[in-house]
């Protein structure tokens, strides 16, 4: 039951917005402002998540666990939330990438989920501390551009630059903490980040993707046909980075251990797109483990804690059978 209650705190758990929360019309341009440095229990601001933020290397130096990362000729301050990292060296570190916090309604209006507004550095720190204790290894929450204290524009998600910023941040973190390998975990659009980083890096020993946006253009086409305003009028999906197109770039020496966890009844990221990714991995000679799970939210989407559990067990050296059993036991516990 405890895991089920924790799942309610995951950003994206609610697809509603507070009545007085800011919104952007389908064709309205965002109005970015100077990055706010959130500390302790200060709740993240929906305005910056919706409109974006900017800062300088000098200001970034004062951001707790902030990294100045440059990509495509522009820099952003990328914030991360570490737990249990040692000074001398860290053989294996678990890293989590969350999903989107900005949603669109049927008319294309953008808003920030109310669950995001309830989050703060303190709540993230508490979740990471618990994950580190469960795994017995250091962990990190990576704040994607424009959200959770990182500068940037969350409207520009899915693009290559977002991937490059996350890649550059991991490079700096690896060097700073003397990390040998990463176990990457990504939920929903965070799954796109993880799949994309596997295409770029050779230090990913394992990856866990839950309800993952891993076939980006396929899913974009699916949703474009279901909005009142065609998606192609709101964004150019051809510019999105689709990790499924470069699966052959995943390292084969060493070969990462890949887990994909899906709810076949998922209504946010269609199950068929995740199945397609798994089949493409197998066709390329990889051996992904595809686990079916049951999310308890109305959209049958929230499997982030299933993914964190699987990653913790991978870090402990558990077998595939043990991991599958633990994920299914979590399913059963949710309904007690």
What residues fall within each predicted segment?
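N-terminal cap/lid segment of alpha/beta-hydrolase-fold proteins
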Residues: 38-88
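Short, surface-exposed "cap/lid" segments of acyl-processing enzymes
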Residues: 73-137
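Cap/lid segment of the alpha/beta-hydrolase catalytic domain
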Residues: 136-161
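Alpha/beta-hydrolase active-site loop
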Residues: 152-177
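Gly/Ala-rich beta-loop-alpha elbow adjacent to hydrolase catalytic centers
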Residues: 185-194
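Active-site nucleophile loop of the alpha/beta-hydrolase fold
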Residues: 208-218
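The feature captures the conserved acid-bearing segment of alpha/beta-hydrolase catalytic domains
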Residues: 218-289
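C-terminal catalytic histidine-bearing segment of alpha/beta-hydrolase fold enzymes
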Residues: 275-336
